[in-house]
Amino acid sequence: MIAVAVLTGSLCGAAFADTNRIDQIRPDAPELAAHGDLPIGVRTLSVVNPGQIDILKVEEGQDLPRYDRPLTPEVWYPAADGTGAGGTYEGVQLRDGVTTVQLTGLAVRDAAPAAPAAPYPLLIISHGYPGNRFLMSHLGENLATKGYVVVSIDHTESTYDNRAAFGSTLVNRPLDQLFVLNAIDGMSKESGHFLSGLVDVSDTGIIGYSMGGYGAVIVAGGGVTQASTEYSWRAPAGTLQMHLAGSESHEALIDPRVKAAVAIGPWGMNTGFWDEDGMKGVRKPMLFIAGSDDDISGYENGVKALFEASVSTDRYLLTFHYANHNASAPMSAPAESWQPSEHLDFIPFDHYADAVWDTVRMNNITQYFITAFFGQYLKGDDELGTYLDLVEHSRDALHALEEDGTPKPEHNYWKGFPARTAKGLSLSRKGAGE
């Protein structure tokens, strides 16, 4: 639930006003990190995907058991003119799957939707293993204020309180992403539904973190290897074969409504789930985001290798140098996560934070690049696309302005970044065929 709150002062900068804010924008944040002008609402949905393989009950040599698979999406959306700002999310679980906390943000629960002249693009957010629909809530709110309907999924058998066999995540993650796309499509066509006239599912982007990024790569066209379907710890009874590169079943997943994808620390390349041949199938523009020291998904043999191998599409690789697997995606560690939990053998804080980078700074930089990327590839905004046309290594960029603020001829600093703030970053880019 989210309860309407009255906030005073700056909504973006008053990190001290409430605990566990998901809407913080640092004073040194790059230009596009700022929230948009639209008020936003939030609602929780429940959907069920019927007749899915029950991975947890599969037995070798037996018929595949089926079940109706429930999912819980959180939806952020532009709200009607005059909607206020501010609310709290109650009962949000931490990494231990037991402790619940309150988050504070901008969205108003069950606010009346906007009545736009044209519907907004759809963005689908997909968490890691484990995670939940609030892990990237900072992105959900931020992007909704900029004219997107954003849907973040609680993936059954992959959340903090019901994490189950990894095989379920391997098989179901891309299926969940596309089922939610279809579910939102259906709702948008229902007369009187709050999504009717609000969202255009033919213009969809996917944002996936870790195993969510794994799913996004598969949906974008990257089929898995035969070897990955045969690992001893694989999805059972050949069930991962449906995502095999070159198979009819995988090709059927490639949905023309999905126009682009962001994969943050996508897991799988470093463990042999993809190879260069399979990655040639990726045909959606991609923004890969990674920490150079990611010891879960890998960097040189992981996310960077995915970027290099996606030769059939335009793609970018944003690197947070010296960051680990938590680069970019998770919200700031809630205050309660700083304390040990008897249910974990590590402090929950470690699930959210990075040892080198400040989380809010990473969130703000990520908001900047995702705003530019989807602005270009979903909204066709060429001006936003210029924010991706950067000197590859920020250390090589020169900030040189005249006294009146106009750029000197040698000025090539990262667009939208204040002086001295584009540190520790690189943005690589390659076009289709490169």
Predicted regions mapped to residue ranges:
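Alpha/beta-hydrolase-fold serine-hydrolase catalytic core, especially in secreted/extracellular enzymes
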Residues: T19-P27, K57, T313, Y322-H325, ...
